[in-house]
Amino acid sequence: MRHPQIFAHRGARVVAPENTLPAFQKALDMNVAGIELDVHCSKDGQLVVIHDFTVNKTTNGKGRVSDFTAAELASLDAGSHLSAEFASSGVPTLHQFFDLVGNRCRVNVEIKSEDPEGGNQVEPLVALIQKRALYDQVIVSSFNPITLLKMRYTDPKIQLGLLYETALPPHLRQAWFTPIMQPEALHPYYPIIDEKLMTWAKNKGCAVNTWTVNDVTEAKRLAALGVDVIMSDVPDLIMAAL
């Protein structure tokens, strides 16, 4: 059985607050193959690492991420919701993440955007990847195909992954999609993965990276099918089982 790479979903979020520097450090300590994280743009145009469109759920603040500057987001308490020991952990910038991680693992950057035209994260993310020479290390994913299309046109060397959680989206089935923008990877929700999907993806030349798998039995099923990446909240558990 071919062993898939295991990515820490939002860092090691079971033992440290998700999408914070401590969670990413603990993921590195587990020797994961990769880390998955989410990015938004702050009020002052910086890429910041947080999952939701608001800060309400994972910090002591209230409001939309885009209404805070990066400095204001850094000053929030993004850790106490898990444990008081992480109270000093704020919302990091993507630059701070890469300062910590360096080239020690692969990175899946998911662009969060409610904008049907793709959002304002594309240009600064492309600039960061170019400046830090991250082409081989980073894959950019999104549920929004327009976001990925903007990425492709802005810099065709950047690796892309299309997220989806139901049956194959129409824009993947249509003939125009492949010549315009075929992603390097498909990121389907794990319950829909079967032999048919794997065969289709491999025939298209796409890797299959799946999320969010926390059950060992399910991880073994996916590994047997030949998925390339398994993203998990418990990467240490999944790695030990495989």
Briefly describe each language-model feature range:
Residues M1-L242:
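Phosphate-group recognition and catalysis centered on beta-loop-alpha active-site segments
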